[in-house]
A protein has these predicted regions:
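Long amphipathic alpha-helical segments that form oligomerization/scaffold cores
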Residues: 47, 51-81, 144-158, 162, ...
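Basic/polar N-terminal segments that are highly enriched at the extreme N-terminus
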Residues: 1-5, 10, 179-187
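Short, solvent-exposed segments of well-ordered alpha helices
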Residues: 3-6, 80-91, 116
Length: 187
C-alpha cells in the first residue's frame, strides 16, 4: 500500500493543479468579458456623446435642410470654394460616419451599438448626399471617397429594413421609403 502513496499523491497534486489552473482561466475569461463589456459601454457612450452633441446635431439638421435642384445648383451654393461653412458642416458629419463605417468594416465595433447610435442619421444623410458624393468621386476625389460611410449606411439600411423602419413595397410613406432607390436601385 505504501508503494502506491507517491502515485496517489502525484495524482492528487496533478488534480489540484488542473483545478487551480481551470479556476484561474475561468476567472481570466470572466475578467476579459467584463473588460469587453466596459469597452463596449465606453465606446457606445463616446459615439452617443459625439453624435448627440449640440454641435453635431446642429450641423446634421442644417445639412438636412439645404436645398438644391441638381449637382450644378449644389456646387454653386454649397461647394467648398463658395461656402466654407456648409463644407465644414458636411465634412464634420460625413467624416464621423466615414470613421464609424471603417470601425464597422474592420470588425472593431459592434453593429448593434452603431444601429442604436447612428442608424437613422447615416441612412438619411447618405440618401440625401449620395449623388453629391458620387459627383465628387467621379470628378475630384476618386472612387473610394467616403466608401466607409457608404458601407455604414448600406449596413444600417439593411438593419432598418429588417426592423420595420421601411415599409413593404416602400408604399406606406415611412421616412425611409423614399430612399429605396439609393440603397436598392434595381427595385
Amino acid at each position: 500500500m505504501i508503494e502506491y502513496l507517491p502515485l496517489v499523491l502525484t495524482g492528487l497534486g496533478l488534480t489540484a493543479s488542473i483545478l487551480y489552473y481551470t479556476s484561474v482561466l475561468r476567472n481570466a475569461n470572466e475578467a476579459q468579458k467584463r473588460a469587453q463589456e466596459t469597452r463596449r459601454t465606453q465606446l457606445s457612450t463616446s459615439i452617443t456623446e459625439k453624435i448627440g452633441s449640440k454641435d453635431f446635431l446642429r450641423d446634421f439638421i442644417e445639412l438636412t435642410q439645404l436645398e438644391w435642384i441638381d449637382i450644378d445648383d449644389f456646387l454653386k451654393k454649397y461647394d467648398h470654394t463658395v461656402n466654407t461653412e456648409s463644407y465644414a458642416q458636411r465634412w464634420t458629419v460625413w467624416m464621423a460616419y466615414e470613421n464609424l463605417g471603417y470601425l464597422l468594416r474592420e470588425g472593431l465595433i459592434d453593429r448593434e451599438i452603431l444601429f442604436n447610435a447612428a442608424s437613422t442619421g447615416c441612412v438619411l444623410i447618405w440618401g440625401r448626399y449620395q449623388p453629391v458624393i458620387d459627383y465628387y468621386r467621379k470628378r475630384q476625389l476618386g472612387p473610394r471617397f467616403m466608401e466607409n460611410f457608404e458601407y455604414l449606411a448600406t449596413e444600417m439600411w439593411k438593419m432598418c429594413k429588417n426592423r420595420g423602419y421601411i415599409s413593404p413595397g416602400y408604399k406606406d410613406g415611412f421616412l425611409f421609403d423614399t430612399l429605396h432607390h439609393i440603397f436598392e436601385p434595381t427595385t
